[in-house]
Amino acid sequence: MTKKQKKVLWCIIATAVLVAVVKLFSIGGVAGTVLYLAAYLIIGYDILRKAFRGIIKGQVFDENFLMAVATVGAIALAVYERSGDYLEAVAVMLFYQIGELFQSYAVGKSRRSITALMDIRPDYANIEQDGKLVQVDPDDVAVGSIIVVQPGEKIPLDGVVTEGSSTLNTAALTGESLPRDAAAGDEVISGCVNMTGVLKIRTTKAFGESTVSKILELVENSSSHKSRSENFISKFARIYTPAVCIGALVLAVLPPVVRLVMGLSGDWGTWVYRALTFLVISCPCALVISIPLSFFAGLGGASRAGVLVKGSNYLETLSKTRVVVFDKTGTLTQGVFDVTDVHHNTMPQKKVLEYAALAECASSHPISKSLQRAYGGEIDRHRVTDVQEISGNGITAKVDGTDVAVGNSKLMDRLGIAWHDCHSVGTIIHLAIDGQYAGHIVISDVVKPHAKEAIAALKQAGVEKTVMLTGDIRRVADHVAGELCVDEVHSELLPADKVAQVERLLSDADGKLAFVGDGINDAPVLSRADIGIAMGAMGSDAAIEAADVVLMDDDPLKISKAIRISRKCLRIVYENIVFALGIKGLCLVLGAMGIANMWAAIFADVGVMVIAVLNAIRALRVDNL
């Protein structure tokens, strides 16, 4: 509990004790009045002070004003009627403060969920000076510096491992508990926790530009983007509160005046009491507090799951998503070429890969890199001579004095070598040794492990259509789309063509359209869609800048989880709106008719607020979605 919350709690206890003393010992007269007024001032002083300040500043119509008018009015009515019953006035303030304390604690719990993410902020960086480790502020570490991260410490800046190996805990960033390995040459990002070995890292970004700073900035700014529901409640409260004050005044004055005109007793006490009850019931705090809290909790729950949403307006839009468009590479596929097959080989597969990897050793093309990875052995460039790259065809070279040709079917035709066609989907690399065909290698962009499951999960989450856009050839695109059960596929697209396809889908879509990309070269499409989702954004500034929703790892299943989180949050928001307005509307009518008394008004105010707040913090629970 905060210091302020403890103070309110002590005021609640003191007031409850004073009221209990008065009731238990049946203290009446002046002593009873003094004790009731003391209890009222103890519990209500803070509210009265806020109401007075609001009047001075011209901000009259808020919940403090309503509570002050209602309770002071109830005391005045008790004095006027000489009943000596000040219990209702004290009870209104007491239960209102209990409700306020409860919602303050709930907001604090929700805020702690978000600020738990702030634990990724590193407090220091270790640098070596004169053979000793010195702790410095991460802001003071220049790009290109060597920092040392010991087991149990957070990585303070993005960089590349130059020495050492370890496992990294990325749970605070991705929501996943599975550690990741890091060794020399691997890129690492700030915010991860080093678990086992000592790492030396050469920094590649200043602290202000590092991943941890970008994420914290995004989270801290998320509350500034209000949803339509929040804006509606804000506007509603500005109109609603003055309206009910006027309504209460009319209820207190008009019926007695009408009765006097009719020659009857004005019965002022009854109608003023009803008006005061009307004021207590009408307090809009259940809506004003629970709706923003629902979104705040939803954003916090999403953050814990590794889904960063830039504002509640995007959370609301995400909940209405009916069409999801994917960029293939890096989203549904891993975006890394791998050797998947070797066919028609006239020598052992390992030897085929060795010849191909050696012939391609001088090339930096992704296909060359994939051949070298598949071979896995040491590349001795001294074994390779007479390398000739034939543009658009492939490479010829001598490996250990043997003529080797590696390339596409055009290279085989050019050299007059008969080759075998391949029905596998992917890039086909043919190999010839001393003019004789030696087989071909199939290289493919591998589908992500959970991609098919992710498409099915989107359907279960209520997404009506899934679309895949790619610059790849039609045969490859159709194969991937068929394997994943994607509804619609468009291939051989340039970046401008992808924007055009999204424009067309937007015009046809019944509901909101989300575009999912890796955030690196998808900025135009991410910004054009109703909601842009960037995947695998750890370390990608472009993704964090361009997207509305950032998934911190490469798991496509997080997309459906993000949609389910948003829908749960909006469902809670609508439940609270309907519940609060329904109960208050009913009690307002009953209060005006004299059926609902001040105790019913207390439930309609504090009880409804507590129930709505309890419902709101359910948005934090996202583990089972």
Residue ranges and their predicted role:
Residues 339-465, 474, 486-502:
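P-type ATPase nucleotide-binding
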Residues 16, 232-262, 277-295, 574-603:
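Bilayer-spanning, highly hydrophobic alpha-helical transmembrane segments
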Residues 63-71, 173, 273, 283-359, ...:
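Conserved catalytic phosphorylation-site environment of P-type ATPases
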Residues 401, 427, 433-575, 583:
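Conserved ATP-binding TGD loop and adjacent catalytic N/P-domain core of P-type ATPases
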Residues 65-66, 91-151, 182, 309, ...:
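Juxtamembrane coupling segments of multi-pass membrane pumps/enzymes
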Residues 2-124, 226, 235, 242, ...:
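Transmembrane helix-loop-helix hairpins at the membrane interface
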Residues 116-209, 313-356, 398-399:
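Conserved cytosolic catalytic loops of P-type ATPases
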